[in-house]
């Protein structure tokens, strides 16, 4: 009986040793960098972030006509945000000169938007037909009780740093 107990212990020792030497399963993978928070402008334009991504302005250029459209969108660029203001300004630096663009609200009977209750603003300038890149600032834009001032960006690069 003693030899049977010793034999059992002898058989158990290699099993324990083998288990201890077994290949360790890898621990949790090193934490990957967080996924980049990306917004996709619905019209394929330039995203301009307002505040800490509270809202966006999407700028879309029609170079053939020199028309620049500004869509006001929520923080995820999924929903249009209507503004009470009839117009807002943007100052662009073009070849060392300041060029002020005034965006005017666009009424849209299909959506019920009117001047003073619109998410689309447009401007037009001859120089937009030939200029493809510029730095700009929106001096002030009021959205739902919050005023964003001194919003700087590059066109067409935008200012989203995520």
Regions found by a protein language model. Name each.
Residues 20-162:
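Intrinsically disordered, low-complexity terminal tails/loops enriched in metal-binding residues
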């Amino acid at each position: 009986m003693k030899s049977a107990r010793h034999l059992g212990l002898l058989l158990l020792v290699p099993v324990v040793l083998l288990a201890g030497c077994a290949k360790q399963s890898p621990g949790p993978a090193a934490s990957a960098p967080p996924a980049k928070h990306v917004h996709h402008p619905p019209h394929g334009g330039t995203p301009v972030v307002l505040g800490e991504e509270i809202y966006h302005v999407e700028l879309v250029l029609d170079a053939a006509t020199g028309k620049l459209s500004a869509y006001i969108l929520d923080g995820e660029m999924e929903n249009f945000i209507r503004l009470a203001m009839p117009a807002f300004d943007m100052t662009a630096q073009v070849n060392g000169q300041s060029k002020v663009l005034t965006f005017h609200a666009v009424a849209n009977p299909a959506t019920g938007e009117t001047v003073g209750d619109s998410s689309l603003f447009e401007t037009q300038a001859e120089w937009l037909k030939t200029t493809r890149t510029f730095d700009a600032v929106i001096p002030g834009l009021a959205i739902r009780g919050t005023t964003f001032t001194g919003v700087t960006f590059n066109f067409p690069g935008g200012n989203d740093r995520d």
